[in-house]
Amino acid sequence: MGIEKLSDFVYSKTKRNKSLNKGGPTIMKKKKLIPCIIAIVAIVLLGIAGVKLYQLMFGGAVKVQTADIISAIAQMKLQLIIGAVILIAGIVILIIGLRKKDENLKDLLKVQGIVAMVLAVVITVNTVCFGPQYSNLSTVLSGTTAISEEHINESLEAAEAIADEGITLLKNEGNALPLASGTKLNVFGWSSVAPVYGGAGSGSSDSSKAASLLDGLHEAGFETNTELENFYTNFRSERPSISFFGVDFTIPEPTMEEYQNANIFENAKAFSDTALVVIGRSSGEGSDLAMNLSDDNNFTIGENGEHVTFSTQEDDLDAEKSYLELSNREIAMLDEVTKDFKDVIVVINSAQPMELGWLDQYDNIKGAIYCPSPGQVGFRSLGKILSGEVNPSGHLVDTFVYDLHAIPTINNSGSFHYTDYEDVTGSADNIVPFVNYNEGIYVGYKFYETAAAEGLIDYDEVVQYPFGYGLSYTSFDAEIADTQDDGQKITLTVNVKNTGDVAGKYVPQIYFNPPYTDGGIEKATANLIVYEKTELLEPGESEAVTFEIAYEDMASYDSDKIKSADGAYVLEAGDYQINLCSDSHHVLDTYTATVDTDRIYDDAHEGKRSSDDQTATNHLDYAKGNVTYLSRAGHFANYGESIAGPTDFTMPEEAKEIYASVVTFDASKYDDADAQMPTTGANNGLKFQDMAGVDYDDEKWDSLLDQLTIDELKELAGNGTFHVVATSSINLPYIYETDGPTAVNSFFTGKFGTAFPAPIMVASTWSKELAGRFGTCIGNELCDFGFTGWYGPGMNIHRNAFSGRNFEYYSEDGYLSGCVAVAEIAAVRKLGIIPYMKHFVLNDSETDRARGICTWSTEQAIREIYLKPFEMAIKEADANGIMNSKNSIGSRWIGSNADVQNTIVRGEWGFKGIIGTDSLDAVSEYYENQNEAVRAGTDKMLCMSYGDDYWADESAGTVIALRNAAHHILYALSNSDAVDVHTGLPVWVYKFIAVDSIIVILLAIWEVFTIREYLAKKKENAEA
């Protein structure tokens, strides 16, 4: 149809409409509704676009508060106002058109009004997408969409290998395991049909393709009772959620009446005399686990406003029980199962240590297996272990005790608030939380081994399974065969022999017991210092394992200045027992090393340790606060006093001054008053790609940094939510980043990688080789998806069993955590990935973390336990990324703590890389001062809503701080695959332009037709 014919068609249709209008007022009234309907449609379209943007940008990657949405809208207000003005103009034009008596002019104005409203939507969406939300959309619509088939297969093989060696055999009475091939199994426990594959939050993974627990049993050749499976599935199909989106501690399990009404036990006995019982517990980001299943069943946590349910099964409510004990319904089920079946095997499917004393209270429980968060294919490994195809070689990464309500940290875990600080500017609820790390260095096994040695506890009455414990289907002998000692380094050769009948792997563990003076530097009697895992040893086969131990690695940190003027690492004179162990408690062989005189690693004595760039001295005295810490002095004489819960809820005055740093921040404390404004916006002709391999201190960096404008410096630092922004002056491409520690987990983009076993399972392998293999596999998946930054690994400490994200972290031990992290990080670094190891530091629980919880601890404990894995990763794996945490050291937010980030991390350890924040949101901005943070060593802000007003003061001090941050960011990127990233516009931009072009062309054609029609009719009327 030609333009003339199309114009004639439109004209004839208009004439027809005119004649219809003469038919009466009803038709005219309906026609007047048309522009209103169109206006409503335009508004709806604009709303849909807004909702879609919200879903894309805030689709679950981080916790989004209402205030974040308000803040994001505030950033878009100019674009929204412009769109609203055009929309209103369109409506006004429509109304004016309707009032015109000239039908020709009326038709023209109606079209103009409609076009204006369409343009309002188009312009608003475009100005928002290419303006304040450009970086977020670039993140949402980033990269490729698939992992290569080769890498998928490699990942699945690695995941299964990790589970093969991470699942831990706890009990095997009378060699009840492995089970005979083809054994019929009654699988009891609701968790058998809804097992725990992983955790919730940033460390979650996609388990939609996972092999179920029952799948794993079937693949291993077992036949299971389908009546039981159907019974549990019909009872409940989904596991209750524990995350920051909602908390339900219900432990699903049918009542005994329901079992009996369905004749479950009678029918099961007819099926088989063997029972497998599955006990599962879940956990996730945003909530610690319930220490009491309170009778007050429902309440709301103030921090995120989520609803908490202790149990929807009222008969399970028990204020004396925790979530990590058997529920009343589970006990009833076990009573019946152990009465009816002679061979009962238990699977513990929980990332947290549970109270398991009941395993020894039922005579018919012959075996027990610990299987924490096995991921996508890990339950296949469980089946293989039960059948004997795989010999278990996992070892515990936490101490399992009989009574979790008696652990030293129990009274100082949870939510405690200061009562005398009522003016927290910006805080919605005026709550200032705190937690006391009262146990000092005596965390996990270090307490139990030392307390037993000092006579405080009867070890066997308190500890059920030691740290490092794990059984095998075979037996091993291990002994120290040779030692070489030059006074600086000890070399041990350990011979391991398989003395059983089945091939297996063994983990020789070396702990040292240092000399201790009563009232002196605090020391534990057992400290893991090296370990290895053997190859698969056939029956009768031996392997010699060599270990090297540096003397300085046995030094303790003297934060109380007992032997050093300013605090230092001190290797005291005396005998050091170097113990070969099967776990933290059972010593197999010993070598004694003697140090003749104290070695004090400060500038006045030995100088710095060989691994340090600068001498370590006290920088965190204020973190100690007014807390009484557990001491070994007098055989733990202050045990009762130190482990009691807080009694003083008044906040120290000096702590108050620091806490609300947005109010108290003073740039003059950081800035040189005589500092000169750096050069910005220079034209030096350098590109980011030119900096690949250039040394951090090379003067060439100054030339590149001089090219950045102040606005670019601000955006590099401030706009860092799952990306690094493209920067035109240096040709820096857009860099994509993603979660998480267990799997590629991009809620923003909807891209999910292989669901590996959780980090706790990786650590439970005690295999550095497998940890490195995990790093390689997740690194390959990150590369396939186009991500350069990885928000992992998670390296916090299992301070106690109730911490919600223990699945996401490795262990209660800093050294073991460090070894796993080193292997993973070294592997991903080889692939050009920047790992943001997190959450730095003392973020060992979820309760109140988003309120900047004040964390009080000794500097000795901070250095020896909580900083240890980060230190190891920087020194041994050249880690070049850190994600700091939302909590505070003392009362100073980590992100604003220059003592830790600049002095210790960059100074002592020589770190040269990016330090980014955990999510910054509008709720917590009253203590997360980004102006101070960038001066204190934080380089990049994970802001839910970016605004450059954080650095409205463009003083020399501010620009210098932003320039330093840019240097850190760009240096890390120059040593990553970012140097090879495509520098053109993102693909989504071209798609957007194409859609815009189509809309504009269609509108233009419509305008041409409309104007031609108007002019033709006007001419016709004039001639008439």
Stretches with model-predicted labels:
Residues 1-579, 583-586, 606-1024:
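Glycoside hydrolase catalytic-domain context in secreted enzymes
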Residues 586-609:
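Short beta-strand elements
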